[in-house]
A protein has these predicted regions:
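Extended, hydrophilic extramembrane loops/domains of integral membrane proteins
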Residues: 22, 199, 214-246
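Non-transmembrane, solvent-exposed regions of membrane trafficking/translocation machinery
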Residues: 1-209, 214
Length: 246
C-alpha cells in the first residue's frame, strides 16, 4: 500500500497512525510517501487464519442443511476439502458454499434517476450496484445507486429465519444490541428515504423507511421463492466467509 501525505507538516502525525494499520507490516518512508508492505510471515498467518475461519463457516452452513458426518478439512495452504456422503442435492450445497454472504445495510443515493444509471457514473461516495432479483423492461438487472458508507454491517445480525408475510416468502432478521441501536438511530433520521440491503455487492431489497425501526428486527422482502428465502436465512445465520470460495 502506498500513501502520500499532502502536507509535509502532517507527516509526523501520519507516521504512528500508519504503523497502527498492521503491526506485521514493514513501513518505508521517503519524503511525504509511505510504503506499507506485509511480510511473508504475516501473509502466511493471515492465509491460515482465513482458511480456518472459512472451515468454521462451511461447517456451520452444512450443519444447517441437516447433513450428517461431513468431512471438512484444510488441504494445503489455500484449499478446503469437503466430502458429503449421501448428499441428495449437491447443486444446492455448491450454491450455499459459493456465496461469501457479506451483507450490509446502506442508504440509497437519489441524485440520479434509476432509468439513467446504465449510462451514468456514480458520484463520489456512492456506487452503482445491480439488483439480485429484478430486471428492467429490457431484461437487464435493475440498477441502484447506493451510498458506500455502511449503516449497519451484517456482523450485527443475531438471527435470520425464512417466514411468510402477506402470503409471500420473506426473511425476518434480528440484530444484536449494538446493531439494533445503530439501525434504530439511522432509520429514525431517515424516515421517508429508501435504504438498500446489499448481499455480495448485489441489492436484494431497497424499501422505503416508513417509520423508525427501533425494535432491532425487520423483514427482507423481495421476489423470493420459498427455497431462496430459506437459503438466504441460512447464509445470514451462519455468517460470512472471510474470502470467496471457488
Amino acid at each position: 500500500i502506498t500513501v502520500t501525505i499532502r502536507k509535509q507538516e502532517d507527516v509526523v502525525r501520519a507516521r504512528p497512525l500508519l504503523r497502527q494499520i498492521d503491526p506485521g507490516a514493514v513501513l518505508a518512508e521517503e519524503g511525504r510517501r509511505f510504503d506499507l508492505t506485509l511480510t511473508e510471515q504475516t501473509l502466511r498467518a493471515r492465509r491460515a487464519a482465513a482458511v480456518q475461519q472459512s472451515i468454521e463457516v462451511v461447517r456451520r452452513r452444512i450443519d444447517e442443511t441437516g447433513l450428517r458426518e461431513p468431512t471438512i478439512q484444510s488441504q494445503g495452504s489455500d484449499r478446503i476439502l469437503v466430502q458429503l456422503p449421501g448428499v441428495k442435492d449437491p447443486e444446492r450445497i455448491k450454491r450455499l458454499l459459493g456465496k461469501t454472504a457479506k451483507m450490509n445495510f446502506r442508504l440509497v443515493d437519489q441524485s440520479i434517476p434509476g432509468a439513467d444509471l446504465h449510462t451514468s457514473r456514480a458520484p463520489p461516495g456512492s456506487e452503482i450496484l445491480p439488483s439480485d432479483n429484478e430486471v428492467d423492461r429490457f431484461g437487464r438487472p435493475l440498477l441502484h445507486l447506493v451510498r458506500k458508507r455502511v449503516m449497519v454491517a451484517g456482523e450485527s445480525l443475531e438471527d435470520a429465519q425464512a417466514t411468510i408475510d402477506q402470503g409471500r416468502p420473506v426473511v425476518s432478521f434480528r440484530f444484536d444490541a449494538v446493531g439494533a441501536r445503530k439501525f434504530g438511530s439511522v432509520t429514525q433520521r431517515n424516515v421517508g428515504k429508501p435504504f438498500a440491503i446489499v448481499l455480495d455487492k448485489k441489492v436484494i431489497s431497497a424499501p422505503v423507511i416508513r417509520e423508525p425501526i427501533l425494535g432491532g428486527s425487520g423483514i427482507i422482502s423481495g421476489r423470493f421463492t420459498t427455497a431462496a428465502a430459506r437459503d438466504l436465512a441460512l447464509l445470514l445465520r451462519t455468517g460470512a466467509l472471510p474470502v470467496p470460495l471457488t
